[in-house]
């Protein structure tokens, strides 16, 4: 099932919040190994080096179309913040992630109940300032938000690096100052500023 908030296929170069989850409150990740595999999917889809190297699969590489700005992997799903050239590329990217993860899960003997039918939702954001607020929301989904390895917080606070992540889109707003971003994370005045509104289309 694919959902979005508004018809935007002709709008170029926008920020999007993507959410991928199992339906009916099922687990999306059964273990940290599953989360690690999903991160490897993000790297494979978004690394420019993967795009330029010889590829052994027919899956598309989205490095030229999508910049990953922030991410969060919890037991119940995936939140991604991206900058993309079009809604069409966002839809194709989300579907590829979901399809490849479904194939991985179906091959795992550790799963008693598969987390599919799953849903993929994408929400067009107003601008980089709304994207900054969303980055805070998805990082705070983790109890140990400051150090959780399955979110992108390390790219903002601890100088974590990778060519598949493009945190500079937001870091430029606060001069790449990790102390500023940490204080931003701790500032409760941002709570409730934005609410997600997803409408099935």
What are these regions (language model features)?
Residues 165-171, 177:
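Intrinsic, low-complexity terminal and presequence regions
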Residues 1-158, 164, 184-201:
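Short catalytic/metal-binding and nucleic-acid-binding patches
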Residues 176-182:
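Short, highly charge-biased, low-complexity peptide segments
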